[in-house]
């Protein structure tokens, strides 16, 4: 398996030499030493700044409230799980869920009650892998949908531990009880627009939470291989299409994108220092049954049925807004292939023994379509005319288009999406009408 090149640092530029008594124009060696010391000081400074930010949100004082009521609610739910853990009965359930057929994987899936996490957990279980879920069941969107996914997993004998990835004691306990071979890290604070009013929840989940997970993994013996959810949002303001893994990712358009970019840099650090095998997956607009209510295809369906206006964004120059919509089953295949091809971590007890695998892949459909096309397909499937409203794209972190180059994933993972948007939306609408229009549930 070929390895990707390490993520380049953005602190490589030299700094002016400190003025003093030395005549650097006459001593290239001294000039080189001064530049080296200056660069070293610069690197040390930014390292301490970054470490300080991590510690700030890791050890946030209880007397310092988050920036909004929503932040307080989210952080409370994610930091203090309502279900107790520990004890013989609990450990028995954990071991039973993680029990594996001979030769298969033993996988901890974080965010297991989420959209992608629940699908991945079911797919792993169905092929005979040992699966244990972890989820904090926060209320970013209706928790009852997460509970319904949990019930689906329980019928497949997958146990979800209710807790948070920032709970170091819980993670340590889980790794003590089960020798996981792999971790599928899908727990994160999602959503681009939500970050504008609830920034602290993104740092807590996507930065501090990722560090907490990597800390547990690097200290485990044996160390698991880690596959985690990055995002296509890291491409930010990139205008080159299609987006390739080697494209620049230093211009995020939202705080969500910035936290995912930070996650990729953190992954590089833990791979380099501790020998963790890490694979990052850049998902492109995943949709399908059991999806997230905050996604456009989901709330468009709800609003079309209710006769509400459907905003169709256009760019300031009247351009089309398009997305690389990717069906959930195709994404799950990419996730499983990433787990199956992940190299072993090379550390032991927090010490690196040799170079470890570090990869990043795009998982998209590579066929972007205008959002207006999405609405048209929903109109036909629902047999209801949408009340369309063309509006300017707000400055809220959204980007005008996404388009994945999947050639690397095709080569390394055998990844090949097969579901077009019309077929995928047909399956989603069938599920939606069955789940919400049965008279038993409200879509909000």
Task: Walk through the language-model features, giving the residues of each.
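Proline-centered turn/helix-capping motifs that create local helix->coil transitions or kinks
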Residues: 227, 236-240, 275, 291, ...
